[in-house]
Amino acid sequence: MVDMTQLQAIYGGTFDPVHYGHLKPVEILANQIGLSKVIIMPNNVPPHRPQPEATSAQRVHMLKLAIADKPLFTLDERELRRDTPSWTAQTLQEWRQEQGPRKPLAFIIGQDSLLTFPTWHNYETILDNVHLIVCRRPGYPLTMAQEADQRWLDRHLTHDVESLHNSPSGVIYLAETPWFDISATIIRQRLERGESCAEMLPAAVLDYIREQGLYC
């Protein structure tokens, strides 16, 4: 029997720094599909991306400031305690073991990440442990480069919210979330040039960035 009352999701990323483009779409998503909790999980050594500019401790502090008044979010630092790359499949398998076999669990990604998903380490095991919730990105198609990958997507894709609650894992749900044209790269560039980005991230996070002399 599936526990239908507590759909939870992990939201991973570098968060260098965390900004409204991270937080607002997920808050809207939670209301749309009935997420009870979103676990923010900062990466330590992202296998596919350059090293973060802020330290792990600084990124964690910024996240704590950003979600201090947002009960939807909690923070999980397990990947920061590893000395190895942050493999999503490993983390999600651990999470499933902790939560038991019946609880509906999900992993939130962007549509851009879905297109490269088959290149992820042990990607084929991920849907054994969680659902995938895909947030739309402008300009990205819903077609995979390889025919076999397209068949995999078509087999698991659903537009039925209830399927996220009625089974513990195994579906890919395409969410209708709004797009916020904000990125950590843009914020870092604007800060480096001494330009304002107050509308892009929480005030407490921006104050901390200035106190620490980050991204300048």
Curated annotation (Swiss-Prot):
What InterPro entries does this protein's entry cite? Cyt_trans-like, NadD/NMNAT, Rossmann-like_a/b/a_fold
EC assignment: the record states 2.7.7.18
- Broad enzyme group: transferase
Pathway given for this chain reads: Cofactor biosynthesis; NAD(+) biosynthesis; deamido-NAD(+) from nicotinate D-ribonucleotide: step 1/1
Cited Gene3D superfamilies: HUPs (3.40.50.620)
Keywords (alphabetical) are: ATP-binding, NAD, Nucleotide-binding, Nucleotidyltransferase, Pyridine nucleotide biosynthesis, Transferase
Report the protein name in the record: Probable nicotinate-nucleotide adenylyltransferase
This chain's source organism reads Klebsiella pneumoniae subsp. pneumoniae (strain ATCC 700721 / MGH 78578)
